[in-house]
UniProtKB/Swiss-Prot annotation:
Gene3D superfamilies: Laminin. Many analogs have been synthesized. Among them, the linear peptide Hunger-Toxin (HT1-0) shows an increased affinity for human melanocortin receptors MC1R (200 nM), MC3R (40 nM), and MC4R (15 nM), and a decreased affinity for MC5R (200 nM). This analog also binds to type-2 angiotensin II receptor (AGTR2), but has no effect on type-1 angiotensin II receptor (AGTR1), vasopressin 2 receptor (V2R), and the five muscarinic receptors (CHRM1-CHRM5). Keywords: Disulfide bond, G-protein coupled receptor impairing toxin, Secreted, Toxin. Peptide with nanomolar affinity for human melanocortin receptors. The natural disulfide pairing being unknown, the activity of all three possible peptides (with the cysteine pairings 'bead (I-II, III-IV), 'globular' (I-III, II-IV), and 'ribbon' (I-IV, II-III)) have been tested. All three isomers show similar affinities on each human melanocortin subtype (MC1R (~500 nM), MC3R (~100 nM), MC4R (~50 nM), and MC5R (~50 nM)). Expressed by the venom duct. This is NU-conotoxin-Ltg1a. SUPFAM superfamilies: EGF/Laminin.
Length: 25
């Protein structure tokens, strides 16, 4: 999940925040 988010989210976002924002379906 963290990897997926880090790749999809911009560098400005943190892995944790991204995980919740762009959580895979």
């Amino acid at each position: 999940l963290f990897h997926y988010c880090q790749c999809q989210c911009p560098p400005g976002f943190k892995g944790k925040f991204c995980q919740f924002k762009l959580r895979p379906p």
